[in-house]
């Protein structure tokens, strides 16, 4: 059975981060379920730049599924929606407590994970302009940060979304599959470490 990913979407989510991650996971053979965290339960999500995405289901219907990872795209308005959703916050906490992977990109780490103190010891990165919202002892200025101690994956923004997606494939389907997907994307040799 292939790995299962739950990708959360909210009004104002950053579309490049969401779509790139979803696309790469599917290419990597990972089954993706998209969940709307919109307060009205609407499945049509208007992202940060006006792109509309259609979620598979409201989070309330899929939160208890058997997923290996939960993914939180950035976009400040979307991340604020995540932060303000008791169901989303509790779902992320459940993933963490059960030893499953939590992945957050861009504004999501500083806006969702830190205020709710979900990872008090996890190393993380995020959107550089929000660096001051992440405790200095946890901040790493890297494109992608994987903290295996707490199963936390974080990344910086739209320009790091491919790296983020490939790291998720590496974690769920193996390095060989990540290399295969990187090759399909015509990634320049030397830019991404799956070519090493």
From Swiss-Prot:
Superkingdom as given in the UniProt entry: Bacteria
Catalytic residues identified in the record: 106
Modified residue annotations for Cysteine sulfinic acid (-SO2H): 106
Membrane-spanning residues: none
Record-listed E.C. numbers: 3.1.2.-, 3.5.1.-, 3.5.1.124
Regions annotated as coiled coil: none
UniProt entry keywords in alphabetical sequence: Chaperone, DNA damage, DNA repair, Hydrolase, Oxidation, Stress response
Post-translational modifications reported in the UniProt record: Cys-106 is easily oxidized to sulfinic acid.
Catalytic activity, as annotated: N(omega)-(1-hydroxy-2-oxopropyl)-L-arginyl-[protein] + H2O = lactate + L-arginyl-[protein] + H(+); N(6)-(1-hydroxy-2-oxopropyl)-L-lysyl-[protein] + H2O = lactate + L-lysyl-[protein] + H(+); S-(1-hydroxy-2-oxopropyl)-L-cysteinyl-[protein] + H2O = lactate + L-cysteinyl-[protein] + H(+); N(omega)-(1-hydroxy-2-oxoethyl)-L-arginyl-[protein] + H2O = L-arginyl-[protein] + glycolate + H(+)
CDD domains in the record: GATase1_DJ-1
Biological processes, Gene Ontology terms: DNA repair
Keyword flag Metal-binding: no
MF annotations from Gene Ontology: protein deglycase activity
Single GO cellular component term: cytoplasm
Oligomer and partners: Homodimer.
Similarity section: Belongs to the peptidase C56 family.
Functional summary from the UniProt entry: Protein and nucleotide deglycase that catalyzes the deglycation of the Maillard adducts formed between amino groups of proteins or nucleotides and reactive carbonyl groups of glyoxals. Thus, functions as a protein deglycase that repairs methylglyoxal- and glyoxal-glycated proteins, and releases repaired proteins and lactate or glycolate, respectively. Deglycates cysteine, arginine and lysine residues in proteins, and thus reactivates these proteins by reversing glycation by glyoxals.
Protein name: Protein/nucleic acid deglycase YajL
Originating organism: Salmonella typhimurium (strain LT2 / SGSC1412 / ATCC 700720)
Encoding gene (name): yajL
């Amino acid at each position: 059975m292939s790995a299962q990913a739950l990708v959360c979407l909210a009004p104002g989510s950053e579309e490049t981060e969401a779509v790139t991650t979803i696309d790469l996971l599917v290419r990597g053979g990972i089954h993706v379920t998209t969940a709307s965290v919109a307060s009205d339960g609407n499945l049509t999500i208007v992202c940060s730049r006006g792109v509309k995405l259609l979620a598979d289901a409201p989070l309330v219907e899929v939160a208890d599924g058997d997923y290996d990872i939960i993914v939180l795209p950035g976009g400040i308005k979307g991340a604020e929606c995540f932060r303000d959703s008791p169901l989303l916050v509790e779902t992320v906490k459940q993933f963490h407590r059960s030893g499953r992977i939590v992945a957050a990109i861009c504004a999501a780490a500083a806006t969702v994970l830190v205020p709710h103190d979900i990872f008090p010891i996890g190393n993380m990165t995020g959107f550089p302009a929000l660096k001051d919202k992440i405790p200095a002892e946890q901040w790493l200025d890297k494109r992608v940060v994987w903290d295996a101690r707490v199963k936390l994956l974080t990344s910086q923004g739209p320009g790091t979304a491919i790296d983020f997606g490939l790291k998720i494939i590496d974690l769920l389907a193996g390095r060989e599959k990540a290399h295969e997907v990187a090759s399909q994307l015509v990634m320049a040799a030397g830019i991404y470490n799956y070519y090493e």
